[in-house]
Amino acid sequence: MERIKELRNLMSQSRTRGILTRTTVDHMAIIKKYTSGRQEKNPALRMKWMMAMKYPITADKRITETIPERNEQGQTLWSRTSDAGSDRVMVSPLAVTWWNRNGPTASTIHYPKVYRTYFEKVERLKHGTFGPVHFRNQVKIRRRVDINPGHADLSSKEAQDVIMEVVFPNEVGARILTSESQLMITKEKKEELQECKISPLMVAYMLERELVRKTRFLPVAGGTSSVYIEVLHLTQGACWEQLYTPGGEVRNDDVDQSLIIAARSIVRRATVSADPLASLLEMCHSTQIGGVRMVDILKQNPTEEQAVDICKAAMGLRISSSFSFGGFTFKRTSGSSTKREEEVLTGNLQTLKIRVHEGYEEFTMVGKKATAILRKATRRLVQLIVSGRDEQSIAEAIIVAMVFSQEDCVIKAVRGDLNFVNRANQRLNPMHQLLRHFQKDAKILFQNWGIESIDNVMGMIGILPDLTPSTEKSMRGIRISKMGVDEYSSTERVVVSIDRFLRVRDQQGNVLLSPEEVSETQGTEKLTITYSSSMMWEVNGPESVLVNTYQWIIRNWETVKIQWSQDPTMLYNKMEFEPFQSLVPKAARGQYSGFVRTLFQQMRDVLGTFDTVQIIKLLPFAAAPPKQSRMQFSSLTVNVRGSGMRILIRGNSPVFNYNKSTKRLTVLGKDAGALNEDPDEGTAGVESAVLRGFLILGREDRRYGPALSINQLSSLAKGEKANVLIGQGDVVLVMKRKRDSSILTDSQTATKRIRMAIN
């Protein structure tokens, strides 16, 4: 108290007040506050104060050799007095202006390469078109979106290795570049950035933008591909939207789109094969999208779509723990349930065995055009809050939720028999039977559901069985909301298992995905999809099957030829001949097969009747289960171009045409490849030339294993014996000579010996 009184006394004298309020601050605590640490405490003030000085900048001494002391107007650019406390020069802001106008220029060649993503964005915006602005309520839902157009799909670890290798090649540290894309990008970037003067850190940062997918969980109403997300702030507000068409596409969006199309085609095709899982894996491994192996894309691409996730599960990759039903992604947000089997009777008195989930659970449902929150108990829908773009989308969500609830009134609303089948002609499981039934017609379902009066709740309205909105009444437990339901944000992935029929289950045994969930929507892929698997030949129609089958035989002729003579049954069962069967008229398949197999047997038995071209031509017909009959054919029919076309047993036709002079085969006018051996040449020529260095011992001896082709002989050791298939379908036993000197005489001897061995 005393001190305060004293201070008050002092302040009452005007001179003291002047001293205390006007003199400089030299209190230690304050000085400490503003001078301790490197962090500037008042940057704005510091800047003003510095710039008011004549020489606020310091620079390296070398600057005096590059910049004149005075500019054209005679103003001083740098001071001759050194900066206190360092050996740097004090420089005027005018020096910066001089440098910008007259200083040295660097090459700009690397800028578009390093800042590629920015340059491309400008181009997209320049060529994009902005349409009118519409004012309306925006139903936005948060989705995980790609915010970085034009990137490759490397993991952050892979990208880190590439960046280190490109930007800091001499730094110590192990870098393992294994994937094809890593090696390709590294090579390309090293070439592009030779002599680059842009700061390495900046180059590294920009490379990261180019190599890694960046995702954010953002509210979106409309397009979710990265070229729309980059202009999100321009195209949608709280109550308005602006139509926009991007001025260009980027590869990452194209990869996502093409991957979905390829995965759907593959799952659909695998479903109808004898072993769906094995077929699916074979197709994934032999397919390329835009020149990149599909399995590599699947490992890196985070796209979540039913077919894509089935392919990932088959490859042993982790996928999202949400499950799919009726085209909606369900994520349980609370509650739990146990499963038990229960038999129920439909309105048509058909018995269905369904797996009932007992217990109270809450789910979010997210679809392409509608989202919902579902609360359910055992076989009872408690509440469903739906939001969607239009009446149709809302109806779809309601049907799926009603079926999912397994309420008795759903099962009783079934009229007629449930006998929906999948592509492989197998009956669908009961839940999908119900779903398909009501997706066709849900009138009775909605009418039987029941109606209730509703309270007036902000942002919610009712919906009647005819799908009209109402503020007084609604279908029991169902409301329409203006607000969307956010997609599940977590990027967590779980270990799953997949069975032979492509049903994907989590570790608790819940089915997350099945082929029934794969959309039938067909799009046109943005990138070229190359299906090398024979199972996908039919994707492009009958002509493609025909051409591909013959191309395959010609490409693999060496091994086909051996199997034809040694193990024909195994050859006939090859899956590469499966697609061809769909081209042969059903009634004729067995007869054609029996006829061709008999013909082939005669060729094997009767000397000198081996005919390469004829074997290639007729081989696919022998793959069907044969019927024994005495029928002879001069031509065989295949269904292409909308009608039956004939393949002649002897001679050429528009379907199958072999040109002797060029040794090339054309199928329906398309080139199917060249035969490397001359089908008409006698035994002596090619074989004896190739058999130099081998001694022919006589006819085939099975103890020495299956027949090799001539090309495989080189792997024999000296003195080793082997059976070998020579041009006309005959097999002889040979031994590799122990000495090289006698090779010259071999060709004459070989010719004689072959004749002797055969005869």
From Swiss-Prot:
Main subcellular location of this protein, as a coarse class: virion
Keywords linked to the UniProt accession: Cap snatching, Eukaryotic host gene expression shutoff by virus, Eukaryotic host transcription shutoff by virus, Host gene expression shutoff by virus, Host mitochondrion, Host nucleus, Host-virus interaction, Inhibition of host innate immune response by virus, Inhibition of host MAVS by virus, Inhibition of host RLR pathway by virus, Inhibition of host RNA polymerase II by virus, mRNA capping, mRNA processing, Viral immunoevasion, Viral transcription, Virion
Motif residue range(s): Nuclear localization signal: 736-739
GO cellular component: host cell mitochondrion; host cell nucleus; virion component
GO biological process terms, semicolon-separated: 7-methylguanosine mRNA capping; cap snatching; DNA-templated transcription; symbiont-mediated suppression of host cytoplasmic pattern recognition receptor signaling pathway via inhibition of MAVS activity; symbiont-mediated suppression of host gene expression; symbiont-mediated suppression of host mRNA transcription via inhibition of RNA polymerase II activity; viral RNA genome replication
Site (Mammalian adaptation): K627
Pfam families named in the record: Flu_PB2_1st, Flu_PB2_2nd, Flu_PB2_3rd, Flu_PB2_4th, Flu_PB2_5th, Flu_PB2_6th, Flu_PB2_7th
Subcellular location(s) of the protein: Virion; Host nucleus; Host mitochondrion
Function as written in the Swiss-Prot or TrEMBL entry: Plays an essential role in transcription initiation and cap-stealing mechanism, in which cellular capped pre-mRNAs are used to generate primers for viral transcription. Recognizes and binds the 7-methylguanosine-containing cap of the target pre-RNA which is subsequently cleaved after 10-13 nucleotides by the viral protein PA. Plays a role in the initiation of the viral genome replication and modulates the activity of the ribonucleoprotein (RNP) complex.
Assembly, per entry: Influenza RNA polymerase is composed of three subunits: PB1, PB2 and PA. Interacts (via N-terminus) with PB1 (via C-terminus). Interacts with nucleoprotein NP (via N-terminus). Interacts (via N-terminus) with host MAVS (via N-terminus); this interaction inhibits host innate immune response.
Name assigned to this protein: Polymerase basic protein 2
Naturally occurring in which organism (per UniProt): Influenza A virus (strain A/Swine/Tennessee/24/1977 H1N1)
Lineage: Viruses, Riboviria, Orthornavirae, Negarnaviricota, Polyploviricotina
Gene name, Swiss-Prot/TrEMBL: PB2
